[in-house]
From Swiss-Prot:
Superkingdom of source: Eukaryota
Pathway note: Carbohydrate metabolism; tricarboxylic acid cycle; isocitrate from oxaloacetate: step 1/2
Assembly description: Homodimer.
Lineage: Eukaryota, Metazoa, Ecdysozoa, Nematoda, Chromadorea
NCBIfam families: cit_synth_euk, PRK09569.1
An annotated GO cellular component: mitochondrial matrix
Keywords assigned by UniProt, alphabetized: Mitochondrion, Transferase, Transit peptide, Tricarboxylic acid cycle
Compartments reported by the entry: Mitochondrion matrix
Alphabetized Gene3D superfamilies for the sequence: Citrate Synthase, domain 1 (1.10.580.10), Cytochrome P450-Terp, domain 2 (1.10.230.10)
Main location: mitochondrion
GO BP term, pick one: citrate metabolic process
Reactions that this protein is recorded to catalyse: oxaloacetate + acetyl-CoA + H2O = citrate + CoA + H(+)
Protein name, entry field: Probable citrate synthase, mitochondrial
MF annotations from Gene Ontology: citrate (Si)-synthase activity
Protein backbone atom coordinates (compact mmCIF):
# COMPACT_ATOMS: atom_id res chain seq x y z
CA UNK A 1 0.00 0.00 0.00
CA UNK A 2 1.46 3.38 -0.95
CA UNK A 3 2.31 5.82 1.83
CA UNK A 4 0.82 9.28 1.40
CA UNK A 5 3.23 12.24 1.46
CA UNK A 6 3.58 14.05 4.76
CA UNK A 7 3.23 17.77 5.36
CA UNK A 8 6.37 19.65 6.33
CA UNK A 9 6.11 21.37 9.65
CA UNK A 10 7.05 24.73 8.25
CA UNK A 11 4.69 27.66 8.17
CA UNK A 12 4.85 31.21 7.02
CA UNK A 13 4.57 32.93 10.36
CA UNK A 14 2.21 35.72 9.34
CA UNK A 15 -1.09 34.21 8.32
CA UNK A 16 0.08 30.65 9.12
CA UNK A 17 -0.06 29.64 5.45
CA UNK A 18 1.30 26.13 4.85
CA UNK A 19 4.02 25.70 2.25
CA UNK A 20 2.04 24.02 -0.50
CA UNK A 21 4.88 22.20 -2.22
CA UNK A 22 4.65 19.11 -0.03
CA UNK A 23 0.99 19.07 0.95
CA UNK A 24 -0.57 15.59 0.86
CA UNK A 25 -2.26 14.58 -2.37
CA UNK A 26 -5.44 12.58 -2.76
CA UNK A 27 -4.98 8.83 -2.96
CA UNK A 28 -8.11 7.95 -4.90
CA UNK A 29 -6.27 5.62 -7.26
CA UNK A 30 -3.82 4.20 -4.74
CA UNK A 31 -2.91 0.62 -5.48
CA UNK A 32 -3.06 1.09 -9.24
CA UNK A 33 0.18 0.39 -11.09
CA UNK A 34 -0.84 2.82 -13.85
CA UNK A 35 0.86 6.11 -12.99
CA UNK A 36 -1.20 8.07 -15.49
CA UNK A 37 -4.40 6.77 -13.92
CA UNK A 38 -3.16 7.75 -10.47
CA UNK A 39 -2.34 11.26 -11.69
CA UNK A 40 -5.75 11.57 -13.33
CA UNK A 41 -7.25 11.38 -9.83
CA UNK A 42 -4.68 13.45 -7.99
CA UNK A 43 -4.42 16.44 -10.33
CA UNK A 44 -8.11 17.49 -10.18
CA UNK A 45 -8.14 17.06 -6.40
CA UNK A 46 -5.04 19.21 -6.03
CA UNK A 47 -6.41 21.86 -8.38
CA UNK A 48 -9.56 22.10 -6.28
CA UNK A 49 -7.40 22.66 -3.21
CA UNK A 50 -5.36 25.36 -4.99
CA UNK A 51 -8.54 27.08 -6.19
CA UNK A 52 -9.89 27.20 -2.65
CA UNK A 53 -6.56 28.38 -1.24
CA UNK A 54 -6.24 31.18 -3.79
CA UNK A 55 -9.83 32.28 -3.25
CA UNK A 56 -9.12 32.77 0.45
CA UNK A 57 -5.50 33.96 0.38
CA UNK A 58 -4.91 35.28 -3.14
CA UNK A 59 -4.09 38.80 -1.93
CA UNK A 60 -1.95 37.73 1.02
CA UNK A 61 1.55 39.26 0.95
CA UNK A 62 4.21 36.60 1.59
CA UNK A 63 7.37 38.63 0.91
CA UNK A 64 8.64 42.11 0.21
CA UNK A 65 11.18 42.52 -2.61
CA UNK A 66 14.16 44.85 -2.26
CA UNK A 67 16.57 46.28 -4.81
CA UNK A 68 19.39 43.89 -3.90
CA UNK A 69 17.16 40.89 -4.58
CA UNK A 70 16.41 42.20 -8.07
CA UNK A 71 20.10 42.74 -8.88
CA UNK A 72 21.13 39.57 -7.06
CA UNK A 73 19.69 36.99 -9.42
CA UNK A 74 16.33 36.91 -7.60
CA UNK A 75 17.95 34.68 -4.97
CA UNK A 76 15.46 33.67 -2.26
CA UNK A 77 12.71 35.61 -4.01
CA UNK A 78 9.43 33.72 -3.63
CA UNK A 79 8.13 33.63 -7.18
CA UNK A 80 7.40 30.06 -8.25
CA UNK A 81 5.17 27.13 -7.39
CA UNK A 82 6.96 23.77 -7.37
CA UNK A 83 5.16 20.77 -5.94
CA UNK A 84 7.83 18.08 -6.14
CA UNK A 85 10.48 19.09 -3.60
CA UNK A 86 11.43 21.68 -0.99
CA UNK A 87 14.93 22.63 0.13
CA UNK A 88 15.09 23.24 3.85
CA UNK A 89 18.16 25.20 5.05
CA UNK A 90 18.60 22.87 8.02
CA UNK A 91 17.34 19.52 6.72
CA UNK A 92 18.32 19.61 3.07
CA UNK A 93 16.16 18.48 0.19
CA UNK A 94 12.81 16.82 0.85
CA UNK A 95 11.15 14.98 -1.99
CA UNK A 96 7.40 15.42 -1.46
CA UNK A 97 8.09 15.79 2.24
CA UNK A 98 10.51 12.89 2.56
CA UNK A 99 14.15 13.42 3.49
CA UNK A 100 16.92 11.50 1.74
CA UNK A 101 17.38 9.08 4.68
CA UNK A 102 13.62 8.46 4.66
CA UNK A 103 13.69 7.83 0.90
CA UNK A 104 16.59 5.43 1.33
CA UNK A 105 14.59 3.53 3.92
CA UNK A 106 11.13 3.60 2.33
CA UNK A 107 11.56 3.48 -1.44
CA UNK A 108 11.69 0.09 -3.21
CA UNK A 109 15.11 -1.25 -4.13
CA UNK A 110 16.51 -3.65 -6.70
CA UNK A 111 16.59 -7.29 -5.68
CA UNK A 112 19.57 -7.67 -3.37
CA UNK A 113 20.27 -3.93 -3.52
CA UNK A 114 20.37 -1.31 -0.79
CA UNK A 115 19.84 1.93 -2.73
CA UNK A 116 16.42 3.24 -3.82
CA UNK A 117 15.40 2.84 -7.44
CA UNK A 118 15.04 6.00 -9.58
CA UNK A 119 11.75 4.55 -10.83
CA UNK A 120 10.51 4.84 -7.25
CA UNK A 121 11.62 8.46 -6.82
CA UNK A 122 9.85 9.23 -10.12
CA UNK A 123 6.61 7.82 -8.73
CA UNK A 124 7.10 9.74 -5.50
CA UNK A 125 7.84 13.03 -7.28
CA UNK A 126 4.81 12.62 -9.51
CA UNK A 127 2.31 11.48 -6.89
CA UNK A 128 3.53 12.28 -3.39
CA UNK A 129 3.19 8.59 -2.53
CA UNK A 130 5.88 6.06 -1.74
CA UNK A 131 5.24 3.40 -4.40
CA UNK A 132 4.80 -0.29 -3.86
CA UNK A 133 7.14 -2.85 -5.41
CA UNK A 134 4.53 -3.48 -8.11
CA UNK A 135 4.14 0.21 -8.94
CA UNK A 136 7.92 0.62 -9.18
CA UNK A 137 8.22 -2.46 -11.39
CA UNK A 138 5.50 -1.06 -13.66
CA UNK A 139 7.61 2.05 -14.31
CA UNK A 140 10.66 -0.09 -15.07
CA UNK A 141 8.65 -2.18 -17.51
CA UNK A 142 7.22 0.88 -19.24
CA UNK A 143 10.57 2.66 -19.58
CA UNK A 144 12.17 -0.48 -20.99
CA UNK A 145 9.37 -0.73 -23.56
CA UNK A 146 9.74 2.93 -24.62
CA UNK A 147 13.55 3.02 -24.80
CA UNK A 148 14.18 2.62 -28.55
CA UNK A 149 15.75 5.64 -30.23
CA UNK A 150 14.63 6.81 -33.68
CA UNK A 151 17.18 6.16 -36.40
CA UNK A 152 17.77 9.84 -37.16
CA UNK A 153 18.91 10.52 -33.59
CA UNK A 154 21.34 7.59 -33.59
CA UNK A 155 22.78 8.72 -36.94
CA UNK A 156 23.12 12.27 -35.70
CA UNK A 157 25.00 11.15 -32.59
CA UNK A 158 27.26 8.87 -34.61
CA UNK A 159 28.14 11.72 -36.97
CA UNK A 160 29.06 14.30 -34.36
CA UNK A 161 32.76 15.23 -34.30
CA UNK A 162 34.87 13.85 -31.47
CA UNK A 163 35.61 17.35 -30.20
CA UNK A 164 31.94 18.29 -29.68
CA UNK A 165 31.31 18.48 -25.93
CA UNK A 166 29.15 15.64 -24.56
CA UNK A 167 26.63 18.14 -23.19
CA UNK A 168 26.26 19.78 -26.61
CA UNK A 169 25.56 16.34 -28.06
CA UNK A 170 23.11 15.54 -25.25
CA UNK A 171 21.22 18.81 -25.75
CA UNK A 172 21.02 18.33 -29.52
CA UNK A 173 19.81 14.74 -29.28
CA UNK A 174 17.05 15.64 -26.82
CA UNK A 175 15.83 18.45 -29.07
CA UNK A 176 15.98 16.14 -32.10
CA UNK A 177 13.56 13.74 -30.40
CA UNK A 178 10.84 16.37 -30.53
CA UNK A 179 9.52 15.13 -33.87
CA UNK A 180 7.96 12.33 -31.77
CA UNK A 181 6.29 14.74 -29.34
CA UNK A 182 2.75 13.74 -28.47
CA UNK A 183 2.30 17.07 -26.69
CA UNK A 184 3.15 19.09 -29.79
CA UNK A 185 0.79 16.98 -31.88
CA UNK A 186 -2.04 17.32 -29.37
CA UNK A 187 -1.62 21.09 -29.18
CA UNK A 188 -1.71 21.31 -32.98
CA UNK A 189 -4.98 19.35 -32.95
CA UNK A 190 -6.47 21.78 -30.46
CA UNK A 191 -6.99 19.47 -27.48
CA UNK A 192 -8.51 20.95 -24.35
CA UNK A 193 -6.13 22.72 -21.97
CA UNK A 194 -7.21 20.41 -19.15
CA UNK A 195 -5.71 17.51 -21.11
CA UNK A 196 -2.29 19.07 -21.70
CA UNK A 197 -0.75 17.23 -18.78
CA UNK A 198 -1.63 13.83 -20.29
CA UNK A 199 0.48 14.52 -23.37
CA UNK A 200 3.26 16.09 -21.29
CA UNK A 201 3.20 12.85 -19.29
CA UNK A 202 3.55 10.70 -22.41
CA UNK A 203 6.46 12.76 -23.72
CA UNK A 204 8.12 12.71 -20.31
CA UNK A 205 7.86 8.94 -20.00
CA UNK A 206 9.23 8.52 -23.53
CA UNK A 207 12.10 10.90 -22.88
CA UNK A 208 13.07 9.32 -19.56
CA UNK A 209 13.09 5.92 -21.23
CA UNK A 210 15.42 7.12 -23.99
CA UNK A 211 17.86 9.32 -22.06
CA UNK A 212 20.13 6.50 -20.80
CA UNK A 213 20.57 5.22 -24.36
CA UNK A 214 21.34 8.73 -25.64
CA UNK A 215 23.88 9.25 -22.86
CA UNK A 216 25.45 5.83 -23.39
CA UNK A 217 25.91 6.37 -27.14
CA UNK A 218 27.62 9.69 -26.44
CA UNK A 219 29.90 8.06 -23.88
CA UNK A 220 30.89 5.12 -26.04
CA UNK A 221 31.39 7.25 -29.14
CA UNK A 222 33.69 9.64 -27.29
CA UNK A 223 35.53 7.36 -24.89
CA UNK A 224 35.10 3.75 -26.07
CA UNK A 225 35.97 4.01 -29.78
CA UNK A 226 32.32 4.04 -30.84
CA UNK A 227 31.66 0.51 -29.62
CA UNK A 228 28.04 -0.60 -29.78
CA UNK A 229 25.65 0.08 -26.92
CA UNK A 230 24.07 -3.06 -25.49
CA UNK A 231 20.35 -3.60 -25.97
CA UNK A 232 17.85 -2.98 -23.19
CA UNK A 233 17.42 -6.02 -20.96
CA UNK A 234 13.74 -6.18 -19.94
CA UNK A 235 14.75 -7.95 -16.73
CA UNK A 236 16.93 -5.07 -15.57
CA UNK A 237 15.93 -1.79 -13.94
CA UNK A 238 16.65 1.65 -15.44
CA UNK A 239 19.98 2.12 -13.65
CA UNK A 240 21.24 -1.41 -14.31
CA UNK A 241 20.49 -1.07 -18.02
CA UNK A 242 22.15 2.35 -18.07
CA UNK A 243 25.26 0.96 -16.39
CA UNK A 244 25.46 -1.92 -18.86
CA UNK A 245 25.02 0.38 -21.84
CA UNK A 246 27.84 2.57 -20.54
CA UNK A 247 29.99 -0.56 -20.36
CA UNK A 248 30.09 -1.06 -16.58
CA UNK A 249 28.90 -4.51 -15.51
CA UNK A 250 29.93 -4.35 -11.85
CA UNK A 251 26.67 -4.66 -9.84
CA UNK A 252 28.12 -2.19 -7.35
CA UNK A 253 28.42 0.44 -10.09
CA UNK A 254 24.71 -0.07 -10.82
CA UNK A 255 24.06 0.51 -7.11
CA UNK A 256 26.06 3.73 -7.29
CA UNK A 257 24.03 4.80 -10.32
CA UNK A 258 20.78 4.19 -8.42
CA UNK A 259 22.01 6.34 -5.55
CA UNK A 260 23.42 9.04 -7.85
CA UNK A 261 20.32 9.27 -10.04
CA UNK A 262 18.01 9.51 -7.03
CA UNK A 263 19.87 12.12 -5.00
CA UNK A 264 20.51 14.43 -7.97
CA UNK A 265 16.96 14.12 -9.31
CA UNK A 266 15.27 17.27 -7.99
CA UNK A 267 16.19 20.41 -6.06
CA UNK A 268 13.17 22.71 -5.94
CA UNK A 269 12.22 24.79 -8.95
CA UNK A 270 14.50 27.81 -8.77
CA UNK A 271 17.81 26.28 -9.84
CA UNK A 272 18.88 27.04 -13.41
CA UNK A 273 17.88 23.74 -15.05
CA UNK A 274 14.53 23.36 -13.30
CA UNK A 275 13.63 27.02 -13.77
CA UNK A 276 14.61 26.90 -17.44
CA UNK A 277 12.47 23.82 -18.01
CA UNK A 278 9.55 25.52 -16.28
CA UNK A 279 10.01 28.80 -18.17
CA UNK A 280 10.27 27.21 -21.62
CA UNK A 281 7.47 24.79 -20.79
CA UNK A 282 5.25 27.71 -19.76
CA UNK A 283 5.32 28.83 -23.40
CA UNK A 284 3.82 25.38 -24.16
CA UNK A 285 6.99 24.17 -25.81
CA UNK A 286 6.93 20.38 -25.65
CA UNK A 287 8.92 18.51 -22.95
CA UNK A 288 11.72 17.65 -25.37
CA UNK A 289 12.41 21.29 -26.16
CA UNK A 290 11.88 22.41 -22.57
CA UNK A 291 14.27 19.80 -21.20
CA UNK A 292 16.82 20.44 -23.93
CA UNK A 293 16.84 24.09 -22.86
CA UNK A 294 17.20 23.00 -19.23
CA UNK A 295 20.28 21.01 -20.17
CA UNK A 296 21.80 24.07 -21.84
CA UNK A 297 21.50 25.71 -18.43
CA UNK A 298 23.01 22.70 -16.69
CA UNK A 299 25.97 22.87 -19.07
CA UNK A 300 26.92 26.24 -17.60
CA UNK A 301 29.91 26.01 -15.24
CA UNK A 302 28.04 27.69 -12.38
CA UNK A 303 25.42 24.93 -12.39
CA UNK A 304 26.78 21.63 -13.62
CA UNK A 305 30.56 21.79 -13.39
CA UNK A 306 31.05 21.72 -9.64
CA UNK A 307 31.95 18.05 -9.15
CA UNK A 308 34.57 18.33 -11.88
CA UNK A 309 36.07 21.37 -10.16
CA UNK A 310 36.30 19.34 -6.95
CA UNK A 311 38.31 16.64 -8.72
CA UNK A 312 40.64 19.23 -10.21
CA UNK A 313 41.08 20.62 -6.70
CA UNK A 314 41.80 17.17 -5.23
CA UNK A 315 44.28 16.36 -7.97
CA UNK A 316 46.02 19.67 -7.33
CA UNK A 317 46.45 18.72 -3.68
CA UNK A 318 47.79 15.29 -4.60
CA UNK A 319 50.15 16.82 -7.13
CA UNK A 320 51.64 19.14 -4.52
CA UNK A 321 51.70 17.11 -1.30
CA UNK A 322 50.83 13.58 -2.41
CA UNK A 323 48.75 11.10 -0.42
CA UNK A 324 51.17 10.75 2.52
CA UNK A 325 50.12 13.97 4.23
CA UNK A 326 49.35 14.78 7.83
CA UNK A 327 46.25 16.70 8.89
CA UNK A 328 48.46 19.64 9.74
CA UNK A 329 50.06 19.63 6.29
CA UNK A 330 46.62 19.54 4.67
CA UNK A 331 45.43 22.41 6.87
CA UNK A 332 48.42 24.48 5.82
CA UNK A 333 47.73 23.70 2.17
CA UNK A 334 44.05 24.72 2.44
CA UNK A 335 44.95 27.96 4.22
CA UNK A 336 47.52 28.78 1.55
CA UNK A 337 44.91 28.07 -1.13
CA UNK A 338 42.35 30.36 0.53
CA UNK A 339 44.85 33.16 1.13
CA UNK A 340 45.68 33.14 -2.58
CA UNK A 341 42.10 34.29 -3.19
CA UNK A 342 40.66 30.94 -4.23
CA UNK A 343 37.78 28.94 -2.78
CA UNK A 344 37.42 25.34 -1.67
CA UNK A 345 35.09 23.79 -4.29
CA UNK A 346 32.37 21.51 -2.99
CA UNK A 347 31.85 23.52 0.19
CA UNK A 348 28.98 25.91 0.86
CA UNK A 349 25.51 26.18 -0.62
CA UNK A 350 23.16 29.00 -1.56
CA UNK A 351 20.40 27.70 0.73
CA UNK A 352 21.72 24.90 2.96
CA UNK A 353 23.23 25.72 6.33
CA UNK A 354 24.47 22.24 7.27
CA UNK A 355 26.23 19.28 5.65
CA UNK A 356 24.29 18.33 2.53
CA UNK A 357 22.43 15.05 3.17
CA UNK A 358 23.33 14.11 -0.40
CA UNK A 359 26.99 14.32 0.63
CA UNK A 360 26.32 12.22 3.71
CA UNK A 361 24.68 9.35 1.84
CA UNK A 362 27.53 9.25 -0.68
CA UNK A 363 29.99 9.20 2.22
CA UNK A 364 28.12 6.25 3.73
CA UNK A 365 28.33 4.43 0.39
CA UNK A 366 32.08 5.07 0.24
CA UNK A 367 32.67 4.02 3.85
CA UNK A 368 30.97 0.73 3.10
CA UNK A 369 32.38 -0.03 -0.34
CA UNK A 370 35.68 1.85 -0.79
CA UNK A 371 36.97 2.85 2.65
CA UNK A 372 40.64 2.53 1.68
CA UNK A 373 40.51 4.48 -1.58
CA UNK A 374 43.11 7.25 -1.45
CA UNK A 375 40.90 9.95 -2.97
CA UNK A 376 38.05 9.07 -0.62
CA UNK A 377 40.41 9.30 2.36
CA UNK A 378 41.48 12.74 1.13
CA UNK A 379 37.84 13.82 0.87
CA UNK A 380 37.24 12.50 4.39
CA UNK A 381 40.19 14.41 5.83
CA UNK A 382 39.05 17.58 4.09
CA UNK A 383 35.59 17.04 5.62
CA UNK A 384 37.27 16.86 9.03
CA UNK A 385 39.35 20.04 8.71
CA UNK A 386 37.76 22.35 6.13
CA UNK A 387 34.60 23.51 7.96
CA UNK A 388 36.70 24.74 10.88
CA UNK A 389 39.07 26.57 8.56
CA UNK A 390 36.20 28.25 6.70
CA UNK A 391 34.57 29.27 9.98
CA UNK A 392 37.85 30.73 11.19
CA UNK A 393 38.27 32.59 7.91
CA UNK A 394 34.84 34.12 8.55
CA UNK A 395 33.59 34.48 4.98
CA UNK A 396 31.42 31.40 4.49
CA UNK A 397 27.76 31.38 5.53
CA UNK A 398 27.83 27.61 5.16
CA UNK A 399 31.20 25.91 5.72
CA UNK A 400 29.85 22.40 5.13
CA UNK A 401 30.30 20.13 2.09
CA UNK A 402 27.64 19.80 -0.59
CA UNK A 403 26.73 16.99 -2.97
CA UNK A 404 29.45 17.89 -5.48
CA UNK A 405 32.21 17.38 -2.93
CA UNK A 406 31.84 13.61 -3.20
CA UNK A 407 30.23 12.36 -6.41
CA UNK A 408 33.27 12.63 -8.66
CA UNK A 409 35.42 10.54 -6.33
CA UNK A 410 32.91 7.68 -6.46
CA UNK A 411 32.77 7.74 -10.25
CA UNK A 412 36.57 7.81 -10.45
CA UNK A 413 36.81 4.75 -8.21
CA UNK A 414 34.78 2.67 -10.65
CA UNK A 415 36.86 3.79 -13.61
CA UNK A 416 34.68 6.55 -15.03
CA UNK A 417 37.46 9.09 -15.20
CA UNK A 418 36.07 11.17 -18.10
CA UNK A 419 35.08 14.29 -16.17
CA UNK A 420 33.54 16.07 -19.16
CA UNK A 421 30.83 13.39 -19.18
CA UNK A 422 29.78 13.89 -15.56
CA UNK A 423 27.31 16.66 -16.38
CA UNK A 424 25.50 14.28 -18.75
CA UNK A 425 25.00 11.89 -15.82
CA UNK A 426 23.70 14.83 -13.81
CA UNK A 427 21.32 15.63 -16.67
CA UNK A 428 19.91 12.10 -16.86
CA UNK A 429 19.17 12.33 -13.16
CA UNK A 430 17.75 15.86 -13.23
CA UNK A 431 15.25 14.78 -15.89
CA UNK A 432 13.29 13.06 -13.12
CA UNK A 433 12.74 16.36 -11.35
CA UNK A 434 12.33 18.67 -14.34
CA UNK A 435 9.82 16.42 -16.08
CA UNK A 436 7.73 15.65 -13.00
CA UNK A 437 7.56 19.40 -12.40
CA UNK A 438 6.56 19.93 -16.03
CA UNK A 439 3.71 17.43 -15.83
CA UNK A 440 2.34 19.18 -12.77
CA UNK A 441 2.76 22.63 -14.30
CA UNK A 442 0.56 21.57 -17.21
CA UNK A 443 -1.81 19.73 -14.90
CA UNK A 444 -2.28 22.84 -12.78
CA UNK A 445 -2.62 25.05 -15.84
CA UNK A 446 0.20 27.33 -14.71
CA UNK A 447 0.46 30.34 -17.03
CA UNK A 448 3.19 31.74 -19.22
CA UNK A 449 5.95 33.10 -16.98
CA UNK A 450 6.35 36.83 -17.58
CA UNK A 451 7.98 38.81 -14.75
CA UNK A 452 8.28 42.59 -14.99
CA UNK A 453 11.75 43.96 -15.72
CA UNK A 454 13.04 47.46 -14.96
CA UNK A 455 16.03 49.50 -16.08
CA UNK A 456 18.39 50.86 -13.45
CA UNK A 457 16.86 54.31 -14.01
CA UNK A 458 13.42 52.86 -13.45
CA UNK A 459 14.52 51.23 -10.20
CA UNK A 460 16.06 54.50 -9.02
CA UNK A 461 12.71 56.21 -9.55
CA UNK A 462 10.89 53.42 -7.71
CA UNK A 463 13.36 53.62 -4.82
CA UNK A 464 13.05 57.40 -4.56
CA UNK A 465 9.28 57.18 -4.65
CA UNK A 466 9.31 54.55 -1.90
CA UNK A 467 11.30 56.87 0.39
CA UNK A 468 8.84 59.75 0.12
Amino acid sequence: MPITGTVLRRFITKGVIPMCQVAPLSTSAEGSTNLKEVLSKKIPAHNAKVKSFRAEHGNTVVQSVNIDMIYGGMRSMKGMVTETSVLDPEEGIRFRGYSIPECQKLLPKAKGGEEPLPEAIWWLLCTGDVPSEAQTAAITKEWNARADLPTHVVRMLDNFPDNLHPMAQFIAAIAALNNESKFAGAYARGVAKASYWEYAYEDSMDLLAKLPTVAAIIYRNLYRDGSAVSVIDPKKDWSANFSSMLGYDDPLFAELMRLYLVIHSDHEGGNVSAHTSHLVGSALSDPYLAFSAAMAGLAGPLHGLANQEVLVFLNKIVGEIGFNYTEEQLKEWVWKHLKSGQVVPGYGHAVLRKTDPRYECQREFALKHLPNDDLFKLVSTLYKITPGILLEQGKAKNPWPNVDSHSGVLLQYFGMTEMSFYTVLFGVSRALGCLSQLIWARGMGLPLERPKSHSTEGLIKLAMAAKK
